[in-house]
């Protein structure tokens, strides 16, 4: 059995790490490189960086910090933000990123997933899905351009359909960003994760809602996700990664202990 992964998420805007609640009202957390170094030293299995306004601003991720991160950490990291072409992806990977993630650009042009997978291999192509639960209809809908509140829009895709579509097109991993739970710290949406797990046959990463160590355990044990991504609990030092992994190990979760 492959070890489950603990993945800190660093949302980047204007060269700094920020964090919002339900993708809104972002506050500055700190500088990118020192935070990345700290998480690697604490025992993170991987890092994910989102340049959150790159797609809505119509630009590729600001690359100046990518190579600096690669110099100070020895764990894999993934970069997302406005990657719309093979050339964009090649530049990010050449600066030291191990994976690239696409979200809004994939919705705008689904063929991009296949072209990236064919060029670089499915193992380094991640598709991020920003999903919102509509309580009135009971449905999960995919959102686009979520880095900019004024441009965020609901797409025609229901979440489960898009999960199946991106796999057909070559996604090697899916990060499910559950917008209703984002930054609220009251737990992952296990009901949604279980539904997605049934149709997701590539590694699935849960994102949005972690507030306690038990929330991570529930995602691994009850929804069988491959990794759990979180931001607020790590940024605010509510949970220490090393202590979290020790706890998960005592609960029978296969996890890499540093």
UniProtKB/Swiss-Prot annotation:
Catalysed reaction equations from the record: 5-[(5-phospho-1-deoxy-D-ribulos-1-ylimino)methylamino]-1-(5-phospho-beta-D-ribosyl)imidazole-4-carboxamide + L-glutamine = D-erythro-1-(imidazol-4-yl)glycerol 3-phosphate + 5-amino-1-(5-phospho-beta-D-ribosyl)imidazole-4-carboxamide + L-glutamate + H(+)
Active-site residues per Swiss-Prot or TrEMBL entry: 11, 130
GO terms assigned for molecular function: imidazoleglycerol-phosphate synthase activity; lyase activity
EC numbers: 4.3.2.10
UniProt keyword Lyase, yes or no: yes
Keywords, ordered alphabetically: Amino-acid biosynthesis, Cytoplasm, Histidine biosynthesis, Lyase
GO cellular component, one term: cytoplasm
Top-level taxon of origin: Bacteria
Protein name, as recorded: Imidazole glycerol phosphate synthase subunit HisF
Organism: Shigella flexneri
